[in-house]
Amino acid sequence: MSAVNTPADFNDYKVADMSLAAWGRRETFIAESEMPALMGLRRKYAAEQPLKGAKILGCIHMTIQTAVLIETLVALGAEVRWSSCNIFSTQDQAAAAIAAAGIPVFAWKGETEEEYEWCLEQTILKDGAPWDANMILDDGGDLTELLHKKYPAILDRVHGVTEETTTGVHRLLDMLAKGELKIPAINVNDSVTKSKNDNKYGCRHSLNDAIKRGTDHLLSGKQALVIGYGDVGKGSSQSLRQEGMIVKVSEVDPICAMQACMDGFEVVSPFIDGVNDGTEASIDKALLGKIDLIVTTTGNVNVCDANMLKALKKRAVVCNIGHFDNEIDTAFMRKNWAWEEVKPQVHKVHRTGAGAFDAQNDDYLILLAEGRLVNLGNATGHPSRIMDGSFANQVLAQIFLFGQKYADLSPAQKAERLTVEVLPKKLDEEVALEMVRGFGGVVTQLTKTQADYIGVTVEGPFKPHAYRY
């Protein structure tokens, strides 16, 4: 898509401001130059058109990088309808650029919960009736859940869903275990070129950026507590350490806790002896009373609960880089404490009660992005080079599932293929190779003798399925 050239009669969209489209297009051009894997897939599959006939319902953060993803899907033959998976994550110039290209999109930064639900519905509906979609691309699982609960008939012709995040994958696995999942899914999140890039290196880049944009604080010498040490927690801990913070980590998984120790982080618990009995008496107030910044990274619920929030140091910064706002008990904060907006997505939450507050009061917490994704609420998320790997995985996963034609199978065949699986390793390696080439790197090829010696082919895949990178 080379220019802003909206069809005169096109109105199948809702964005904040169409005058931002030219700006969004300029930023998209820059992003394309930083996304070699995605652009490589456009070139590689342009003639083949592997997504011709695909009608994709997409729900993922409507950023500049997502604009490149959307236009790659379209370039490979797909039709799409799009919304954002987070009320604060849309970059309005990106949404405008996509609408200007004649692609249905329903997203703007600062949606209410009701508007968010409306946007999801508009993704599904065309001219007031369910669109004849046959593929889903999701981030977090809200779109997938809505289709299963409210529009199950659509799923009869859907070949599958590709899911971007840890949270969404958990929801899919739960649905599968309960017998509720009606279509196969590709777990894009656990592709190596997604989890090690997006979750780890992306958070390493974007977390400190968001905190500094939101607060203008110097982070050096201050104490941080990172809740969780999975890939997101690892990247987040590195992000804060490289700013000079004294970083402590809280974990429930002994293996991840061991990794944190080996990486040089002190493993602590906000609860005395690690046990949360639901009372304030179980809180390690001495620890939390020294914490200047707390970051949740888990994808789990209430990992920063009301009792922890009560015990935190005055004026501490609280934020989340997991998925939903329920990692932090923001419901308790809204019910019991007064909120003062400093600027969009930055609030002073006064712990002196729910009524009027004294602006000079110093017993407050600084909450970023209302407990939602801080890197997209207070900044622009991961850089294009990081999202290149994630979105190249999405494209290959869409091609793979669309080619499997699940909706056309017999009931017996469907029963066999109703799974939640990661992308085949060979495709993961294809993404990685394009990314390495984008850096100007050269990958060494095995000789036939070397390949035979370790039991692989010269072309790969090079590692067994269970290999942990």
Swiss-Prot record:
Gene3D superfamilies according to UniProt: Adenosylhomocysteinase-like, NAD(P)-binding Rossmann-like Domain
Subcellular location: Cytoplasm
Single GO term (MF): adenosylhomocysteinase activity
Protein encoded by which gene: ahcY
Pathway annotation from the record: Amino-acid biosynthesis; L-homocysteine biosynthesis; L-homocysteine from S-adenosyl-L-homocysteine: step 1/1
Designated name of the protein: Adenosylhomocysteinase
Cited PROSITE patterns: ADOHCYASE_1, ADOHCYASE_2
Top-tier EC class: hydrolase
Keywords: Cytoplasm, Hydrolase, NAD, One-carbon metabolism
Recorded superkingdom: Bacteria
Signal peptide: none
